[in-house]
Amino acid sequence: RVRDALERVGGVHLELPPVLGAESPLRYRNKVQFPVSRGKCGLSIGFYRPRSHDVVDTEDCLLQPEADTALRLAFKGWMEDFQIPAYDESTGRGLIGHLYIRTNRAGEALCCVVANGKELPHTGELSGALRAAVPKLAGLVLNVNLRDTNVILGDAYRTLWGRDWLEEELCGLTFRLSVPSFFQINRDQTERLYQLALEFAGLTGEETVLDLYCGIGTISLCLARLAGHVIGAEVVPQAIEDARANALRNGVTNAEFFCGDAG
């Protein structure tokens, strides 16, 4: 497909290098967003059926860490025990829309409950159930999304227990990730990708590099070790806050970040 786009659409003819595949195709994803629904078969927390918004309850997903399954099952048990209503897209009623989980290389997990309301009942019982399922739970966050939209996350967040971030190491740097932070799903492949990009760039230490759509600054800070100066731009305010904090955390002084539309 890439070759076809380059040759047929772009009129560019070149030899493509071999694909650098992952060492393991299993358990590599560091983030998951489970939709929640209650239908004829009861409460379902899993994934959408192809080409639909029907939620299929899943026993496991081999692309996710085992901690994700443990947290999903504990969350489902909490909803059943306290009869917490799932959000219904057709009526706009109900409370729980999604369960969001982020994990890091150290085995920690950050859970976010996406709700159609500003309050979540029985939060003490929920945090206890999640911590029992995964002792390395770092935090539990409530995201409020009152809009009738396909966008999963709303704009308002509240920490219910623990902290609202994880730290992750990438290419020898440490990054703080909040719930809305963009971070590549496959850590190991991301490191290979960034290292290859740095080789292709052939930086000498004199360049000023622009990193558009920079997210939390992962590529920017990797480039900064070899470039003279790096400027990152991103439209998401929280991501820019994270990028600036990550630069300070890693002692990078030749990178600056601006919030704005890079397009």
Over which residues does each language-model region extend?
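Rossmann-like S-adenosyl-L-methionine
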Residues: 122-263
